[in-house]
Amino acid sequence: MTSIEPTHTGKKVIVGMSGGVDSSVSAYLLMQQGYQVEGLFMKNWEEDDNNEYCAAAEDLKDAQAVCDKLGIKLHTVNFAAEYWDNVFEYFLAEYKAGRTPNPDIMCNKEIKFKAFLEFADEILDADYIAMGHYVRRRDNSDGSTQMLRGVDGNKDQSYFLYTLSHEQVARSLFPVGELEKHQVREIAKEMGLITHDKKDSTGICFIGERKFTEFLGTYLPAQPGNIETPEGEVIGTHQGLMYHTLGQRKGLGIGGMKNSNDDPWYVVDKDLERNVLIVGQGGHHPRLMSNGMTVNQLHWVDRTGPVDGCHITVKTRYRQQDVPCTLTYTDEHTLRVVFDEPVAAVTPGQSVVFYDGEVCLGGGIIDQLIRG
């Protein structure tokens, strides 16, 4: 492995150690660059008594093993109260309102780059914090700092970090953002880190391995209703609108229908007033397509954002190909976005993130769809 010349001797970095391979290698790379590195493990959720979910204890054990191997200190902090107030209650409120939220984005905004940064600053006297996210930062000659997509396009996590401020990006380091995932695992294996072959965590932390419907049903009462076609024909029942999102194909419980073709059924709309789930056949059903959207709760990394009328690209969901679009400001808090070509399954309540090439500009929340 190529050795890295130490260049940052004395600067203190607190690395968010999750017990996974990305944060493990982040800590190692920063040590190689000459930083004074310490780890901080966050506990963000109080598990059930049987500790079946989230595996926080196992993650802490792995984080400690990595820190011991690297010879660095590991601190722990409990942000469960902050997580409940700022992330989980938002998650429930959005589902209750019939929207589909993204708690990972809110967690990054309120916990990993706010509560964590404040703790690292005030208690641990940090110069920087670091996370195992696949994004990059670029420091420009004019003193500004930009957030860029990660080198590994398949792992790029800029979509989840669009709410970061310019100041937060400037205080954060993202070592693995410069690497492909396979390189990260190779480094971890070469260094003998216990996490080198640990499976990536997926899903929402507080749900763990449980079925989503089972978990959500313990906090929000389900309201069963009808499943209808756009023409109003009742073809089934649902257990609750909150369990379904636009574009969903699996889990609808609709078999072969008389007089219908063989195309699969998709959720194309929700009628909240009537508690009806509307489905149509084919992934490009007209009710599933949007020509644009209005976006509110805007946040720009550089505070100013793109100019009115500009032509850039947008992601309306994670892992989606960028979509070319044109932006028009309705006011300083709201955008009208028109796509070059219609887009399927644009979902109110979800985040959209705007890009200028490799630069993540910021984003907002989908409010209403523009159709026809």
Swiss-Prot record:
Cellular location(s): Cytoplasm
Keywords: ATP-binding, Cytoplasm, Disulfide bond, Nucleotide-binding, RNA-binding, Transferase, tRNA processing, tRNA-binding
Annotated region described as Interaction with target base in tRNA, given as residue ranges: 102-104
Binding-site positions, ATP: G16, M17, S18, G19, G20, V21, D22, S23, M42, G132
GO BP: tRNA wobble position uridine thiolation
Disulfide bonds: C107-C205
CDD domains noted in UniProt: MnmA_TRMU-like
EC number assigned by the record: 2.8.1.13
Chain spans, region Interaction with tRNA: 155-157, 317-318
Chemical reaction(s) catalysed: S-sulfanyl-L-cysteinyl-[protein] + uridine(34) in tRNA + AH2 + ATP = 2-thiouridine(34) in tRNA + L-cysteinyl-[protein] + A + AMP + diphosphate + H(+)
GO MF, any single term: ATP binding
Active site location: C107, C205
Gene Ontology cellular-component annotations: cytoplasm
InterPro entries in the record: MnmA-like, MnmA-like_C, MnmA-like_central, MnmA-like_central_sf, Rossmann-like_a/b/a_fold
Residues flagged as site, Interaction with tRNA: H133, Q350
A Pfam family this chain is assigned to: tRNA_Me_trans
Family statement: Belongs to the MnmA/TRMU family.
Job of this protein: Catalyzes the 2-thiolation of uridine at the wobble position (U34) of tRNA, leading to the formation of s(2)U34.
Protein name: tRNA-specific 2-thiouridylase MnmA
Organism: Shewanella sp. (strain W3-18-1)
